[in-house]
Amino acid sequence: MLLRLDFSLDTPIYLQIRNQIVRGIAAGELVPGQLLPTVRALAEDCGVNMMTVSKAYSQLKQEGYIRTDRRAGTVVLEREDRELPEPIRENLLLALSEAKAAGTNRETVLDLVKEVFA
């Protein structure tokens, strides 16, 4: 799995890892049942501490994106259609409000939605 981490950003590295895995799932690059790298392997590939990857995986588990089994490893979970969780709804509303306040037009936002849901 190829992650692009930017150590110059204010965004914590564990969160960059988490966000890129979520985007990979949304884009279909990571599919249900797919085995993810071990914490050690991903940490080595990214050049980060194992605790950083462990924190990202822990958050992904809490959010229901992945499952870890000591023998089977860490796999992407199947996601069924369901109601939008309130924290995601709030973040989405804030992001859309910020885009509108910044002068972004409706078509640009709709193009982004189509890109994610393609």
Where are these regions (language model features)?
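Extreme N-terminal segment that seeds HTH/winged-HTH DNA-binding domains in transcriptional regulators
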Residues: 1-35, 41, 86-118
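Short, cationic-aromatic polyanion-contact patches
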Residues: 14, 72-88
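Intrinsically disordered, low-complexity segments enriched in polar/charged small residues
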Residues: 23, 45, 60, 75-76, ...
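Beta-hairpin "wing" of winged helix-turn-helix
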Residues: 29-34, 61-71, 76-78
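Short loop/turn and capping residues at structural boundaries
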Residues: 35-36, 54, 71, 80, ...
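N-terminal helix-turn-helix
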Residues: 36-67
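Short Asp/Glu-rich motifs
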Residues: 43-44, 79-80, 118
